[in-house]
Every structure is written in C-alpha cells, then in structure tokens.
UniProtKB/Swiss-Prot annotation:
GO terms (BP aspect): fructose 1,6-bisphosphate metabolic process; gluconeogenesis; glycerol metabolic process; reductive pentose-phosphate cycle
Gene3D superfamilies: 3.40.190.90, Fructose-1,6-Bisphosphatase, subunit A, domain 1 (3.30.540.10)
Binding site for Mn(2+) 2: D97, E100, E225
Stated family: Belongs to the FBPase class 2 family.
Organism taxonomic ancestry: Bacteria, Bacillati, Cyanobacteriota, Cyanophyceae, Oscillatoriophycideae
This protein's name: D-fructose 1,6-bisphosphatase class 2/sedoheptulose 1,7-bisphosphatase
MF terms in GO: fructose 1,6-bisphosphate 1-phosphatase activity; metal ion binding; sedoheptulose-bisphosphatase activity
GO cellular component: cytosol
Catalytic EC class: hydrolase
Organism: Microcystis aeruginosa (strain NIES-843 / IAM M-2473)
Length: 345
C-alpha cells in the first residue's frame, strides 16, 4: 500500500494546504475549509484506489463532500472497470481533516495543517462526532503513562521516562473553560502549560519528536481528530489513548446530542457497547498498514506553512507509515506557471 499510495497522499494534503492557505488571514474560516475539501477530494479521485471516508466533514446530510461513507478514487467511478482490476484492488478506509485548525487559518495563526490517515478496510475506528479525552506522550513513555491516572501522576511517570525534571516538561492543553482544573493541576505539579486555541493533532504528533519542546497532550478535544492523531502516533511508536465523552455536562457546549441518554443510545446503535472504554492507538488505528500524511498550511512546530512566490509555492509535508517505519519530511516546490525565480528558503 505504501509504495503505491505514499507519494500520492502527500500530493493530496499539499493541494488541500495550498488551496486553504490562499484564505489565510482573511477571517473566512468556512471558505478556508471548503476550498481545502474541494482540493483534497479532487486529488483523491485521481488515485487508483477504492477509498471510503470513515472520518470526514460530517454525516452525508450535513456535508456535500468528503462526508462519512463517501467513496473516493478512480476505482469508485462509473467506468471503473476499464481502469481497475477487482482482483488486485485493496479497499481503503480514509480519515481526513482537510483544514485542521480553520480558525488558525482564518486569523493567520500558527499550527494549521491538512491531514489524512489511511488503512485497509476496517483499519480505522469510525469515531462518532463526539468529544474525546486524550493523552499523548513520547515513545519512551508508551505504556507507562495512563489516561486513568491523574495529571500529577502522569507527570511523575513522564519525568522518569524522559529523565527530566517535572519543571522541564511542557504539556499542551486546549484553551477551554472545561480545562481550568486540569491546567491548574499541571501547574501545581510544577510542569509548564502551552495553551492552544485549536489544532490538537499537531500537538499530539509533536510529542513523538524530540526537539519540539512538547512532552504531552492532555485534555478533551474532538473524537475524529483523536483517531487521526492515533494513526500518526501508531506509525511513530508514541503513546496515545482516547476515551469517548458522551455526557454534554462534561464539555458544556458543542457536543452532538442533547442528552447523555441520547448519546448513549447513539453509541449503542453504532455497536459501541462499552462507552467508557479506553482506546489505545492500536485500537483506534488497528490496520496492518497505516499511513499518515500532513502538510503545513500555516507555520507549525513540525512544518513550515505554505509560502507563495511569483509563479508558484513551496510546501513542507510529513508522511509516516507503520510499514516502512519511517518519517519523511518532504519539501516541495510547486510551479503554477513560468516563475521568474524559484523560492529556495
């Protein structure tokens, strides 16, 4: 799968990032997202595959493109038989976030990117549009920290695993009222807190790379992005755990569903019989082969944002895989027409 799709999924996120970055700083988050969705879908439909969106822009009646259940790729088209051999075809599940951090793009802030994860059919957890309690940590802490422990306990464990004092640790937390007590506990334990307004996928992945000065992600964010983060962390050998949040009182706002009982019923309909289960990255991204790709829209911890020059643009992307156990940073110059010069730095 990697040998045939690796380069193409990089191009998918590159095109989404370029499209969205043209709306950077214009205050139009919905437009920045919409053009990224269009660009991502158009490029995916040119790939020799039969793909199915398991995490996308929403339910079919809520999203015109890249909705959950939508099929993408050349081999899903009406005349697919002339292009595709069914005996050689691998069906693929896809999780996408064409513009992760729409507010970041709209207001010209750092940390937004276009992301996707793919695996064979059934290899990615089809998370409902709920919230998820998350814990991400470096590979050295995998299996040692635990989402059921307090932040204080996990910081002590993390300190031992990384051979650092707690005062040297940096924990990323979403800047939300629901995290007031968590933030205070982290600070009381002696660690430092980096608050972010959006974009916790980037924060989770950054835990797996030394030199980012991010050592953990804690708190509650969107469940679909949790699956994408888990796919990346599985490729990188990092620690990731997620637990679905189905009680609206926990997050106070924005949760799909009006009641705890209604949300529990919805989970039951989806076949989730243990709503309190803690999922590891091997369960959220359980496929034999998992690929993850991201491209910076605005500058971030791991990647530069899209940089335009006369006649073209330059992007930085990341592609990682469970198969090759590699993390490739890809620097690409895109020539839209005959440029007067090519941007090198």
């Amino acid at each position: 799968m990697e040998s045939t799709l690796g380069l193409e999924i990089i191009e998918v996120v590159e095109q989404a990032a370029i499209a969205s970055s043209k709306w950077m700083g214009k205050g139009e988050k919905n437009t920045a997202d919409h053009v990224a969705v269009e660009a991502m879908r158009e490029r995916m439909n040119k790939i020799h595959m039969r793909g199915r969106i398991v995490i996308g822009e929403g339910e079919r009646d809520e999203a015109p493109m890249l909705y959950i259940g939508e099929e993408v790729g050349i081999c899903t088209q009406v005349d697919a038989k002339q292009y595709c051999n069914p005996d050689e075809l691998v069906e693929i599940d896809i999780a996408v976030d064409p513009c992760e951090g729409t507010n970041l793009v709209a207001y010209g802030q750092n940390g937004s990117m276009a992301v996707l994860a793919i695996s064979e059919k059934g290899g990615l957890f089809a998370a409902p549009d709920f919230y998820m309690k998350k814990l991400a940590a470096p590979p050295a802490a995998k299996g040692h920290v635990d989402i059921n422990k307090s932040a204080t306990e996990n910081l002590k464990v993390l300190s031992d695993c990384l051979n650092r004092s707690i005062e040297e640790l940096v924990v990323v937390v979403m800047d939300r009222p629901r995290h007031k007590e968590l933030i205070q506990e982290i600070r009381n334990a002696g660690a430092r807190v980096r608050l972010i307004s959006d974009g916790d996928v980037s924060a989770a992945i950054s835990c797996a790379f030394s030199g980012t000065n991010i050592h953990a992600l804690m708190g509650i964010g969107a469940a679909p992005e949790g699956v994408i983060s888990a796919a990346a962390m599985r490729c990188l050998g990092g620690h990731f755990q997620g637990q679905l949040i189905y009680d609206p009182e926990v997050v106070k706002t924005g949760l799909i569903g009006e009641s705890r009982e209604g949300n529990l019923a919805r989970l039951q309909e989806m076949g989730i019989t243990n709503p309190d289960r803690v999922y590891g990255c091997e369960e959220l991204a359980s496929g034999e082969t998992v690929l993850f790709a991201a491209c910076g829209i605005t500058p971030g911890t791991l990647m530069e944002g899209v940089r335009f020059f006369h006649g073209g643009a330059r992007t930085q992307s990341l592609v990682i895989s469970t198969q090759s156990k590699t993390a490739r940073f890809v620097d690409t110059v895109h020539l839209f027409d005959r440029p007067k010069y090519i941007q090198l730095r």
